[in-house]
Amino acid sequence: MSKYILIASMDIDPEKEDLFNEVYDTEHIPAILNVPGVINVERLKSQTMKMNFGGQVRDMDTSQEPTYTAIYRIEGPEVLETSEWGKAVETGRWPDEVRPYTSNRQFVLRKMME
């Protein structure tokens, strides 16, 4: 079976950032990891960057990119349609205390190359 990754990216209101990180790490990810077909979850935070190309070191504009990204490795796209997934994303404080304060939300599903 092919593996897939779901990439979920978003920003959070600054006054809710500590709660966002706490809930994501202690409630949201553990709930998602209990969903059949979910293999792994990793979180990332964007950083400013410079890159050398065209013979020059340049500042890269990442201002439109969401601050936080989570990468969910899953068995297949059908995992995202299960009742278990639906239940997991509504668990704990996420739906009422965190989700309303997120913005610039982006989701993309990618099939891993074999």
Named regions from a protein language model:
Residues 1-114:
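Macromolecular interaction modules
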